């Protein structure tokens, strides 16, 4: 124990944190953690589902509430599973001089054990073993000389730290770099400014200091109030905190407030739709974002969101303030969780004789395999870095899914030996007819099968989950290599591979933007669904498209695209998008367009007698109203003003959404019976679960 205390004194002197891993039986790990923590004063916060009663603890699911706070020493319990997001978040809260003690299973069997955390990112109902990530993680721990590994049955050996200069902690005054940025910000009359940095670099501190220098009013917003603890330590006491949605609601109600600066901390964790809506209300905005990690990735945020802003100035902070440079804890977790982006990721390629599309001979497309990543870790690093740069919601959860979740398919595109593009697909479909029927009816929603289930539950394509498909989860091309056909080449390659596997279709879900849809359309995809709500992540309406491969896939694509075109006249009342879809002029006078066909009867029966959502049935309801003379006040108000549910409920004297939905279903039932009672009964029986329908036919 003397070495433990000596190292802690060194850590305090050098301003660094250190990781100590206890590996063995569960009870042994806990006992040693208690003994070690008793040797040194500190917070010794436990992140565990099964912490001893005598310690301060919280589960991994609540670690996000700690962001913006600081602790001295902690214990992270990974005996039943590794929540890497919580691990990264916890490490970011530890002060210089701290130990992070990590409890893990016996070293030799760890990679073979079911990991409880897999329930968050795998589509399996039971925990699965995660050998690829655990072996990768173990390698990083063993490769770092400053990590202490104490295995049960072996002595505790703590190597002394290499000699380095004593650490001089920040004294509350801005550093030279912070001073430079503050000077530029104070001189700015308007604009959007972004500070990017890894954790512990003082970006929140700088934001707080800006309020002290501003003569006008400053407001603060962030994903949560607790995330602004450090910012508010340095901010003026009169700088209020606003939740992002509450701030937007206030601005929409009262207009632009008389505010000098809006400070947005950890901006990558706030929906881009909210950010886009907030920007016009404020003359000067300072946003901070972590370069990598668990709140979303700052580099991707810059590429996706900030690149579209006409006036945006980006600053970076590189030197740590809360601990010394080359901190052992930060270093090993950066390596293990692939937080460090390859320096040459966005370097431009050599010119290709002025061609806009790379010759196929220069493009090497290959299938990536998790087994190969253990022997060629640089390939994993490049693939994951590309995904992070192109999708700023990418997190360590995706790294775990990428390495160990079943049904993942990854293809990479190499140019001159460098990986410049990645395509990630996920297996979907293959559900039984009865389960697909229940998904369509809204009775069941099993894990996984994102697009396949949504096509059934929302687009009315009840048999979509029974077909075999692969969904495009992510596609990423290095920023300097775009517009050269790499993305299309990846899709074409995996289309051929899917055809070899006798799959029915490929699918993709994306935030609808005309240029993005143009890309998917150029790859052969057909639009089959537009969601009725804005996505929180993209601020766009969700779109789904499929690329048919088999006869059944072509039938599905044709049915879906024709249904969307037929419904779009009415769906536009809910979804203000300008889609180039084939439509009949004067559609309400076109008998074929407004006739109730079997698809409409199925849809309406699903709404009336099961749990189909109103949004999925809206167009069929509008057609139904043309054919019935019943008053149906709730449905007619819905057709006229579909986005004003609260007002409709109040007009009808109903309390709440549930009561209104119940009334809509009742009125639909009445209309079906009035139109054709026998046909309505046939479809009611079709909608029922198999066993219930059988009982109804044979009472």
Curated annotation (Swiss-Prot):
InterPro entries: Acyl_CoA_acyltransferase, GNAT_dom, NAT10/TcmA_helicase, P-loop_NTPase, TmcA/NAT10/Kre33, TmcA_C_sf, TmcA_N, TmcA_tRNA_bind. Its main location: cytoplasm. It is an enzyme of class 2 (transferase). It catalyses: cytidine(34) in elongator tRNA(Met) + acetyl-CoA + ATP + H2O = N(4)-acetylcytidine(34) in elongator tRNA(Met) + ADP + phosphate + CoA + H(+). GO terms for biological process: rRNA acetylation involved in maturation of SSU-rRNA; tRNA acetylation; tRNA wobble cytosine modification. It is found in: Cytoplasm. One of its GO terms (molecular function) is ATP binding. Residues 408-547 form the N-acetyltransferase domain. Keywords: Acyltransferase, ATP-binding, Cytoplasm, Nucleotide-binding, RNA-binding, Transferase, tRNA processing, tRNA-binding. GO terms for cellular component: cytoplasm. It holds the Pfam family GNAT_acetyltr_2. Belongs to the RNA cytidine acetyltransferase family. TmcA subfamily. PANTHER family: N-ACETYLTRANSFERASE 10, RNA CYTIDINE ACETYLTRANSFERASE. Catalyzes the formation of N(4)-acetylcytidine (ac(4)C) at the wobble position of tRNA(Met), by using acetyl-CoA as an acetyl donor and ATP (or GTP). This is tRNA(Met) cytidine acetyltransferase TmcA. The lineage of its organism: Bacteria, Pseudomonadati, Pseudomonadota, Gammaproteobacteria, Enterobacterales.
């Amino acid at each position: 124990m003397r070495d433990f205390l000596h190292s802690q004194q060194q850590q305090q002197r050098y301003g660094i944190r250190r990781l100590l891993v206890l590996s063995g039986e569960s009870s042994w790990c806990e006992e040693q953690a208690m003994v070690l923590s008793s040797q040194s004063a500190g917070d010794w916060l436990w992140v565990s589902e099964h912490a001893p009663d005598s310690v301060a603890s919280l589960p991994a699911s609540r670690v996000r509430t700690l962001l913006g706070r600081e602790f001295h020493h902690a214990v992270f319990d990974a005996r039943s599973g590794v929540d890497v997001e919580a691990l990264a978040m916890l490490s970011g809260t530890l002060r210089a001089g701290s130990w992070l003690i990590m409890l893990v299973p016996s070293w030799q069997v760890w990679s073979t054990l079911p990991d409880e955390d897999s329930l968050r990112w795998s589509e399996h109902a039971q925990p699965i073993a995660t050998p690829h990530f655990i072996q990768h993680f173990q390698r990083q721990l063993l490769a770092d000389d400053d990590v202490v590994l104490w295995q049960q049955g072996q002595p505790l050996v703590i190597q002394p730290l290499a000699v380095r200069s004593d650490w001089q902690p920040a004294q509350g005054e801005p550093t030279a770099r912070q001073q430079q940025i503050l000077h530029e910000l104070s001189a700015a009359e308007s604009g959007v400014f972004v500070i990017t940095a890894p954790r512990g670099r003082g970006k929140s501190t700088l934001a707080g200091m800006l309020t002290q220098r501003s003569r006008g009013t400053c407001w603060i917003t962030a994903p949560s109030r607790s995330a602004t603890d450090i910012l508010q330590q340095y901010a003026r006491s009169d700088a209020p905190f606003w939740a992002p949605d509450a701030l937007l609601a206030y601005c929409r109600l009262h207009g632009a407030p008389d505010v000098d600066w809006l400070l947005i901390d950890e901006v990558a964790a706030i929906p881009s739709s909210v950010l886009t809506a907030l920007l016009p209300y404020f003359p000067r905005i300072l946003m901070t974002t972590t370069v990598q990690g668990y709140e979303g990735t700052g580099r991707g945020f810059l590429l996706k969101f900030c690149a579209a802003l006409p006036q945006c100035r980006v600053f970076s902070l590189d030197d740590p303030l809360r601990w010394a440079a080359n901190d052992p804890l930060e270093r090993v977790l950066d390596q293990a969780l692939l937080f460090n982006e390859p320096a040459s990721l966005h370097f431009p390629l050599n010119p290709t004789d002025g061609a806009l599309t790379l010759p196929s001979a220069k493009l090497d497309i290959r299938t990536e395999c998790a087994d190969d990543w253990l022997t060629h870790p640089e390939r994993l690093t490049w693939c994951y870095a590309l995904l992070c740069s192109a999708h700023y919601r990418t997190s360590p959860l995706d790294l775990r899914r990428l390495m160990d979740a079943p049904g993942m398919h990854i293809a990479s595109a190499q140019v001159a030996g460098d990986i410049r593009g990645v395509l990630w697909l996920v297996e979907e479909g293959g559900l039984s007819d009865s389960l697909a029927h229940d998904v369509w009816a809204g009775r069941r929603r099993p894990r996984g099968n994102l697009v396949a289930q949504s096509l059934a539950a929302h687009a009315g394509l009840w048999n979509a989950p029974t077909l075999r498909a692969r969904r495009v989860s992510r596609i990423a091309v290095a920023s300097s290599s775009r517009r050269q056909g790499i993305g299309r080449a990846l899709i074409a390659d995996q289309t051929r591979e899917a055809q070899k596997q006798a799959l029915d279709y490929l699918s993709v879900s994306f935030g609808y933007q005309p240029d993005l849809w143009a890309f998917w359309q150029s790859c052969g995809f057909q639009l089959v669904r537009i969601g009725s709500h804005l996505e929180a992540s993209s601020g766009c309406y969700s779109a789904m498209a499929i690329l048919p491969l088999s006869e059944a896939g072509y039938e599905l694509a044709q049915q879906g695209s024709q249904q969307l075109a037929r419904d779009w006249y009415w769906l536009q009342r809910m979804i203000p998008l300008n889609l180039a879809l084939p439509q009949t002029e004067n559609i309400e006078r076109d008998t074929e367009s407004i006739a109730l066909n079997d698809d409409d009867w199925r849809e309406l029966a699903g709404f009336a007698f099961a749990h189909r959502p109103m949004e999925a049935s809206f167009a069929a309801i509008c057609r139904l109203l043309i054919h019935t003379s019943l008053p149906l006040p709730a449905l007619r108000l819905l057709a006229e003003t579909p986005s004003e549910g609260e007002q409709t409920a109040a007009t009808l004297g109903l309390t709440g959404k549930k009561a209104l939905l119940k009334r809509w279903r009742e009125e639909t039932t009445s209309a079906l019976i009035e139109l054709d009672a026998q046909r309505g009964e046939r479809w009611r029986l079709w909608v029922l679960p198999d066993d219930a329908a059988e009982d109804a036919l044979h009472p």
